[in-house]
Swiss-Prot record:
<protein>
    <recommendedName>
        <fullName>V-type proton ATPase subunit D</fullName>
    </recommendedName>
</protein>
<dbReference type="GO" id="GO:0005886">
    <property type="term" value="C:plasma membrane"/>
</dbReference>
<keyword id="KW-0968">Cytoplasmic vesicle</keyword>
<dbReference type="GO" id="GO:0033180">
    <property type="term" value="C:proton-transporting V-type ATPase, V1 domain"/>
</dbReference>
<dbReference type="GO" id="GO:0005654">
    <property type="term" value="C:nucleoplasm"/>
</dbReference>
<keyword id="KW-0206">Cytoskeleton</keyword>
<comment type="similarity">
    <text>Belongs to the V-ATPase D subunit family.</text>
</comment>
<dbReference type="InterPro" id="IPR002699">
    <property type="entry name" value="V_ATPase_D"/>
</dbReference>
<dbReference type="GO" id="GO:0005929">
    <property type="term" value="C:cilium"/>
</dbReference>
<comment type="function">
    <text>Subunit of the V1 complex of vacuolar(H+)-ATPase (V-ATPase), a multisubunit enzyme composed of a peripheral complex (V1) that hydrolyzes ATP and a membrane integral complex (V0) that translocates protons. V-ATPase is responsible for acidifying and maintaining the pH of intracellular compartments and in some cell types, is targeted to the plasma membrane, where it is responsible for acidifying the extracellular environment. May play a role in cilium biogenesis through regulation of the transport and the localization of proteins to the cilium.</text>
</comment>
<keyword id="KW-0375">Hydrogen ion transport</keyword>
<keyword id="KW-0966">Cell projection</keyword>
<dbReference type="GO" id="GO:0098850">
    <property type="term" value="C:extrinsic component of synaptic vesicle membrane"/>
</dbReference>
<dbReference type="GO" id="GO:0061512">
    <property type="term" value="P:protein localization to cilium"/>
</dbReference>
<keyword id="KW-0472">Membrane</keyword>
<dbReference type="GO" id="GO:0060271">
    <property type="term" value="P:cilium assembly"/>
</dbReference>
<dbReference type="GO" id="GO:0005813">
    <property type="term" value="C:centrosome"/>
</dbReference>
Length: 247
């Protein structure tokens, strides 16, 4: 096993405990990222479905708005000059909010009306009904355009977040966890080898002590048989020592 396949660490019991904790942390992180990816994917599919529905509805609304414009021009004449003259500031404005999905911030756009209708009296002479219908249709078109912009922005943001999350999951699952597992296996192998070496060393020491003891006992028996070894004195025996007189 090369050093690139595992983490460079000195094999010990403490290192084994650390690697086990890191492995558990990596597995927990992978599981959390998978749950995050699933949540993002679910929201991604919901937004995709909503985009398709909104685009289909957008086509119908824009077609209806174009017909309303043609109808209003036919009934009320060319009112573009009146519209241009009454332009002061935007009556329809956009504000942005934020939505959080599994830690990913998604922008949400909303439209709102500000001020009074500058074209309230437009078409009072003729074509008032057609102009009112025209304003309603284009107001609906603006509403759908804002909603579509919000959905598409969220779609792109989620797509990028899902890719990043999946890359992290793959990195943890196929690089980090296997590397920690190989490091842990290396530590266990080294510790087992040390235990075997220590057991073999202790066994050899015991055998050597046994040989030395047997040799000593044989030598002692031989010397006893030859009368070279005196029996040890019994310190508990009741023997009287001779009196020593000092002159």
């Amino acid at each position: 096993m090369s050093g690139k396949d595992r983490i460079e660490i000195f094999p010990s019991r403490m290192a084994q405990t650390i690697m086990k904790a890191r492995l558990k942390g990596a597995q927990t992180g992978r599981n959390l990222l998978k749950k995050k990816s699933d949540a993002l994917t679910l929201r991604f599919r919901q937004i995709l479905k909503k985009i398709i529905e909104t685009k289909m509805l957008m086509g119908e609304v824009m077609r209806e708005a174009a017909f309303s414009l043609a109808e209003a021009k036919f009934t009320a004449g060319d009112f573009s000059t009146t519209v241009i003259q009454n332009v002061n500031k935007a009556q329809v404005k956009i504000r942005a909010k934020k939505d959080n999905v599994a830690g990913v911030t998604l922008p949400v756009f909303e439209h709102y009306h500000e001020g009074t209708d500058s074209y309230e009296l437009t078409g009072l002479a003729r074509g008032g009904e057609q102009l009112a219908k025209l304003k309603r249709n284009y107001a609906k078109a603006v509403e759908l355009l804002v909603e579509l912009a919000s959905l598409q922005t969220s779609f792109v943001t989620l797509d990028e977040a899902i890719k990043i999350t999946n890359r992290r999951v793959n990195a943890i699952e196929h690089v980090i966890i296997p590397r920690i597992e190989r490091t842990l296996a290396y530590i266990i192998t080294e510790l087992d080898e040390r235990e075997r070496e220590e057991f073999y060393r202790l066994k050899k020491i015991q055998e050597k002590k046994k040989i030395i003891k047997e040799k000593f006992e044989k030598d002692l028996e031989r010397r006893r048989a030859a009368g070279e070894v005196m029996e040890p004195a019994n310190l508990l025996a009741e023997e009287k020592d001779e009196d020593l007189l000092f002159e």
